[in-house]
Amino acid sequence: MGLITTEPRSSPHPLSPRLVHELGDPHSTLRATTDGSGAALLIHAGGEIDGRNEHLWRQLVTEAAAGVTAPGPLIVDVTGLDFMGCCAFAALADEAQRCRCRGIDLRLVSHQPIVARIAEAGGLSRVLPIYPTVDTALGKGTAGPARC
C-alpha cells in the first residue's frame, strides 16, 4: 500500500510522534488522517486493517479519542478502506465504550452495506452507530451525559 499521511489535529492531544512514524512507514497498509471540526474529531482511514496492523489501528483510535472532549463526537470514516477485518470492529467497539463513559459518541461512517451487516452480525450495531456520510454523522447532536 502507499505512503500513509497522518495529520495531527492542532489540539492539546496530537497524535504521538511514534504513531505518526509507524503510520508513515512505506510498508504500512493503513493510511489515516485526522481532522478537527468544532468539538468533533474525525479519523479518515484508508487501505486495510487486519491482524498485521491491528496494533496501529487501536493506537490511532485510542490516541484520537483521547483528544476529544465531551460532547465530541469521535467520527471514524472508513469509506476509504479496502478491507476491514473483525479486529478493526473490535477495536472500535472497545473505544466506543470508553468514549461513552466520557460522554462522547463514537460514530462510524460507511456507505458499504457489508460494514453494517458485519456490525449487526457481531452484535455491535448498538455500540457502533453507522452513518452514510461524515456530514450526517456530524449533524446528529451530542452524546449527552456519560453512560457506562
From Swiss-Prot:
The keyword Transmembrane helix does not apply. Keywords: Stress response. One of its GO terms (molecular function) is anti-sigma factor antagonist activity. Residues 30-141 form the STAS domain. Induction: Slightly induced towards stationary phase. Induced by heat and oxidative stresses. Coiled coil: none annotated. The keyword Cell cycle does not apply. Pfam families: STAS (PF01740). InterPro entries: Anti-sigma_ant, STAS_dom, STAS_dom_sf. Belongs to the anti-sigma-factor antagonist family. PANTHER family: ANTI-SIGMA FACTOR ANTAGONIST TM_1081-RELATED, ANTI-SIGMA FACTOR ANTAGONIST TM_1081-RELATED-RELATED. Interacts with unphosphorylated OprA. This is Putative anti-anti-sigma factor Rv2638. It comes from Mycobacterium tuberculosis (strain ATCC 25618 / H37Rv).
